[in-house]
Structure formats: C-alpha cells, structure tokens
Amino acid sequence: MKRTYQPSKRRRSSEHGFLKRMGTANGRKIISRRRRHGRKQLTRV
C-alpha cells in the first residue's frame, strides 16, 4: 500500500501557496488573520 503523503513542491505551492491564498477572498482573510497574529510564516511555501 502506498503512503498517503507523497511530497511535491509544485503541488504544495499550488494548493497552499501565497498566490493561491491571495486569489480568493477567504484566502486573503487567512493571510490577514496570520498577519494580525504575528506569524513569521504566512504560508507554508
């Protein structure tokens, strides 16, 4: 059986990246919430 996590940089950025977040209203909410909270890393990419 294959393991569930098969890492890929391209897939990671296209699904969780900064540009993807900024592309939707809810994504922008996430970014602003993380900024307010003082996160060093806004997205995981």
From Swiss-Prot:
Gene Ontology terms: biological process: translation
Keyword Ribonucleoprotein among UniProt keywords: yes
Q: Which one Pfam family would you cite for this protein?
A: Ribosomal_L34
> What are the disulphide bonds in this sequence?
none
Show the InterPro entries listed in the entry. Ribosomal_bL34 (IPR000271), Ribosomal_bL34_CS (IPR020939)
Question: Source organism's superkingdom?
Answer: Bacteria
For this protein, what is any one GO molecular function term?
structural constituent of ribosome
Q: Name one GO cellular component term.
A: ribosome
Q: Which residues form a coiled coil?
A: none
Compositional bias of kind Basic residues: 1-13, 30-45
UniProt keyword annotations, A-Z: Ribonucleoprotein, Ribosomal protein
Annotated region (Disordered), positions in chain: 1-45
Protein family membership? Belongs to the bacterial ribosomal protein bL34 family.
Supply the name of the protein: Large ribosomal subunit protein bL34
What species is given as this protein's source? Protochlamydia amoebophila (strain UWE25)
